[in-house]
Amino acid sequence: MSFQTLERERTFKNPPKDGTSFPDLQKAVKPHVDSFNALTNAGLLNYAVKEIGEKCAFDSITQEEGGALKFGNKISFRVDEVQIAKPMLSSRERSSINRKVYPAEARERLTTYKSRLVLKFSWSVNGGPRQSEMREVGMIPIMVRSNRCHLEGLSPAELIAHKEESEEMGGYFIVNGIEKLIRMLILPKRNHPTAIIRPSFANRGTSYSQYGLSIRCVRPDQSSLTNTLHYLNNGVTMFRFHWRKNEYLIPSMMILKALLETSDKEIFEGIVGKDLGNTFLTDRVELMLRAYKSYGLYSQTETLQYLGSKFRVVLGVAEDLTDVEVGRFLLQKVVLVHLREAKDKFRLLLFMIRKLYALVAGECCADNPDSPQHQEILLGGFLYGQILKEKIEDWLNSIRAQINLDVRRSAPGVDFSDRKYLTRVFSKINNDIGTKLQYFLSTGNLVSNTGLDLQQATGYTVVAEKLNFYRFLSHFRMVHRGAFFAELKTTTVRKLLPEAWGFMCPVHTPDGSPCGLLNHLARKCEIVTHPSDVSQIPSLLLSLGVDPPSVVGHESGWGCVQLDGKIVGWCTYKLAKHVADVLRLMKIEYAVKLRNGTATEPAKVPLDLEIGYVPPSHNGQYPGLYLFSNPARMVRPVKHISTGELDMLGPFEQVYMDIACFPKEIVPKVSTHVEYSPTNVLSIVANMTPFSDFNQSPRNMYQCQMGKQTMGTPGTALRYRTDNKLYRLQTGQTPVVRPKLHNTYGLDHYPNGTNAVVAVISYTGYDMEDAMILNKSAHERGFGYGTVYKGESFDLSQKRRRGEPVVHHFGFAPGSTPRREWLQKLDADGLPFIGIKLEDGDPIVAYYDESTGQNFIETYHGTEPGFVDEVRLLGNDVGDSECQQIHVKLRITRSPIIGDKFSSRHGQKGICSQKWPTVDMPFTESGMQPDIIINPHAFPSRMTIGMFIESLAGKAGACHGLAQDSTPFIYSEQQTAADYFGEQLVKAGYNYHGNEPMYSGITGQEMKADIYIGVVYYQRLRHMVSDKFQVRTTGPIHNLTRQPVKGRKRAGGIRFGEMERDAVIGHGTSFLMQDRLMNCSDYAQSWVCRDCGSIISIMSTISMNGVGSASEVRCRSCAKPALGLEDTSDIWQDGSGKKFVGGTNTTLIALPSVFNYLTAELTAMNIKMMLEVK
């Protein structure tokens, strides 16, 4: 390995003009970009509008004498085509020659990168000739580097010319200047019936059991609908579906009878086949057939008519459709929607019933919905297309609703043949679909009438933070299980399953609440985004001996062959195994021809076809041969042993295959595949941990998180970014010790830390509990020196209502005399000088009101000084009005101070506890002084041996000028890392084990023990004292509890919790607790009755003789009404004039104010609190 320093320098000076230098980096984001491209390239939007179909309305509906409805003129309308343009300047802007709008402009102007959405709207009246027109329905956000972005296909040199990173990957949207990403979610595998045992199913009604079968059916436009079969204890199965967030149940027999003109015998044979000896199965089918007789529906027409009459109102169909047509519409829209033909739906439903009965009988086990075998990925582009489809349908529904409203109100001019009438309808409805999509991206909230067959309504988008490049890249490889699962108390969904090998990284997941729910794709895991051509598969299967599908019963002991949820045949399990092997060889052979350029015809078997052969077993998974070619599947490359060629595997088929991790693990005639590299199981970020195979696993997990929290290099085009907060490491270095993949992904473009000389020694008392001592001279030379950039925007247009004239302008009012202190910071145009230092309260921008001639300033609010780095003037979309908005970027210097957090790449985090003078630092024989000193106690319990190895390797690499390879799994017990790097150290004249004699910097004497010293790559994390320190003497308090409010920004108090309480007691300073928890918090004085112990019944009173008694505060509860016989001096009265005696035994005590509040709350609940006063 080499550092590639000169090559990198040449690349920066002369960026490539032909293509990317790091194809693997672009490939990491490919699923996001390709899924958005599929909206137009794969015709998903055209499929969507075809699926929406026609809407219709009538200009009159009257009821005739027989009860029949008479319809007037009928208008039928639909959307024929969807067009998404590329972002261009507004047509109102007429001066520009180049009219393209690039993402950099949207970032800098804090606007949305969007383009026009145009629909081809067509209509006909009474079935006459069809008319059409193009309607613009708003501006929709566009994904960066997609086929609707001007950056598509640009080389690094061209990207730099357009103010982008040289390796800009895209895959995100820009909304109001913020980069937003639709994150990937896990969904159930499409078009595959999944057996489920769920106790909650039994709560749905009488006779319902815990057994069910679910299938998530996906249409060609990628919208989905989940169908569920329920098993009832009386043998009947019920078919469940959702329509517009409402749930409906229909007997499965009714669906079967409605799909085809069939007989009970055909249904019996279709479920049972030739397996007549299975009495459990035959009894249940017979019970189901008998139970259906109660409906009295025998023919297909009768059944369709019955369904149509029940669901007419629910479906909201046209009034002129018959009940039979409504029934057919129901079957088309909600029953196994991935299949078009009724006979295919019929066959699959029979198979599902058969599998459900097998689950109940214990012939097969329930499928695990938490296993990647039964999961797929919801891609951002597909979700975006589904939302767009629903908004288009809502738009059509709003047109129909407006026409119906006009007809009901007998509005003048309702004439379907008049084009002007439709124009008036369009003017009355909301034609802006783009704003709804922009709202979705900016908030992540899904506003939907149907719910889109998803389990959550929020949390779909995240900000693609550029804290550092690791964090930015991780966003695109992140896969979330779903918000619903985060609330579950069970940990089952979080478990790492063996089926995830090679698809989900076992290391890269957060610790804490999202652990196991927020995962990341393995490095080589890809996601299919386009459906493959499998039109030749059915005929190929028939030629291999598979029996064609038929309604009549299949042989006993035969397995079902399915292709994307469609039954394509039946065969024996032995033949199914043979067919699976043949298909695999055929797809590999075609891939070889394709690579060699010898392919002359389309592939019969596409390379990414998933061939899932499930063998028969005892109480195992339901057997069969399942083929999948649809999008959103995870696939990964492995090496096929017999041919030596690449094969793409999916998680469904991998479970039943024998894949060796290393070539030496291959078992002859058993292993079929071998991994290309054992590191392919890890994510990109997890692969960057050096020698991760030497570390305890939690430490590798911690490093994956801390690597993304590092103050690093977010990018090279920082001049053109307007982030709210941006961190930058000024003295970033390339690591001496790094894996080969560090160069593969070009991470030297974005350095994330600094190489430091680290000594492991307990030298002072300042290195306890993971603290580290920093060499003061290393700090002065720039170790860990960083900068924080903060952006502030000032918009004068928000100071006026829409439509009002512009009266506010930047600068000072003509003829006015600004203050001298303002002019020290601000120029004559009211904007700050570049490079000026701003303290808290200093003016940052000035503006004036031309109507009053008054000057105003906006001040800088910050706890630390900032320097004005850039000032941007932001115009509007057309550029035809005065500048009303500016953006100021502030540079805040952050050199490391005591309390700032650092970490190595092995999860060894700690804070800087002291900057030690270099004259007092220990030194080696050669005069080398460590940059960092850490305590030896950091290692025994953490077992981060990888950090020892890195120290050895870094020291040897620095001596020889080598970039050391730290890829995991390359060393073994026969060839150890310690030997390899130890010999390099010996050649450089150092100790084999990395130890050196060191001399005390205070006494100059040699230390008795040799000290372990070497070079380790250290990261400075973003957790800094400057952002977190909190001091309070007095400040705002809560109006109810009278305690200090919380929050650093609000000058709030510091939390004193149970651990702090225990520490104070443990140190024998318990009186400090009273000071902290009461005297300095909510100290209050309150009167209490000594007799009854109440603080609620105390009241101020008036003495009858007018002379103040010993206690003017008395207890109303202990007092008795005065009878007039008592001494006048003992009688007192309350505010209403009632006279009492007694209740004088009260005293003043100190209490927390919140205790009074608690007492009042308990009293409201009829709970009396009594205090014992001594």
Curated annotation (Swiss-Prot):
- Report C4-type zinc finger ranges: 1089-1118
Q: Does the keyword Metal-binding apply?
A: yes
Against CDD domains, the record matches this protein to: RNA_pol_B_RPB2 (cd00653)
Recorded hits in Gene3D superfamilies, A to Z, give:
2.40.50.150, 3.90.1100.10, DNA-directed RNA polymerase, subunit 2, domain 6 (2.40.270.10), RNA polymerase alpha subunit dimerisation domain (3.90.1800.10), RNA polymerase Rpb2, domain 2 (3.90.1110.10)
InterPro entries, per database record: DNA-dir_RNA_pol_su2, DNA-dir_RNAP_su2_dom, DNA-dir_RNAP_su2_hyb_sf, RNA_pol_bsu_CS, RNA_pol_bsu_protrusion, RNA_pol_Rpb2_2, RNA_pol_Rpb2_2_sf, RNA_pol_Rpb2_3
Which Gene Ontology BP terms does the record give?
Answer: transcription elongation by RNA polymerase I
> Which reaction(s) are listed as its catalytic activity?
RNA(n) + a ribonucleoside 5'-triphosphate = RNA(n+1) + diphosphate
Which PROSITE patterns is this protein grouped with?
RNA_POL_BETA (PS01166)
Describe the function of this protein. Answer: DNA-dependent RNA polymerase catalyzes the transcription of DNA into RNA using the four ribonucleoside triphosphates as substrates. Second largest core component of RNA polymerase I which synthesizes ribosomal RNA precursors. Proposed to contribute to the polymerase catalytic activity and forms the polymerase active center together with the largest subunit. Pol I is composed of mobile elements and RPA2 is part of the core element with the central large cleft and probably a clamp element that moves to open and close the cleft.
This one is known as Probable DNA-directed RNA polymerase I subunit RPA2
